């Protein structure tokens, strides 16, 4: 009985923590995606794209933009920040950037 009670308490604590922890998909080419909790203070997810000199996203075989990296950041400086060949965009959702989400 004590073991069952202890198990319920541990599961409750874990579930409560998951509700307040930002999860971002982490990826550096090549695959796979890896979801990870963001460090404290880094509560925004971002995606990094390869762009050409006109700041347009480069497509992979004309199908979709090449995402170079995903991760956590403290704050977003706005859409389209980054260097001339690397475009960073923040995601509006938790665990953004997977193949099943558009953000």
UniProtKB/Swiss-Prot annotation:
One cellular component term from this protein's GO annotations in UniProt: extracellular region
Coiled coil: none
CDD domains named in the record: TFP_snake_toxin (cd00206)
Cystine connections: 24-45, 27-37, 38-72, 76-90, 91-96
GO molecular function: toxin activity
Alphabetically ordered keywords of this record: Disulfide bond, Secreted, Signal
Tissue expression summary: Expressed by the venom gland.
Signal peptide: 1-21
Source superkingdom: Eukaryota
Compartment(s) where it occurs, according to its Swiss-Prot or TrEMBL record: Secreted
Extra remark beyond the main annotation: Negative results: does not bind to muscarinic acetylcholine receptors M1 and M2 (CHRM1/CHRM2). Is unable to compete with alpha-bungarotoxin for binding to nAchR at concentrations up to 100 uM. Is not toxic to mice at doses up to 3 mg/kg.
Family classification: Belongs to the three-finger toxin family. Ancestral subfamily. Orphan group XVII sub-subfamily.
Protein name per its UniProtKB record: Cytotoxin-like protein TA-BMBGT3
Species name: Bungarus multicinctus (Many-banded krait)
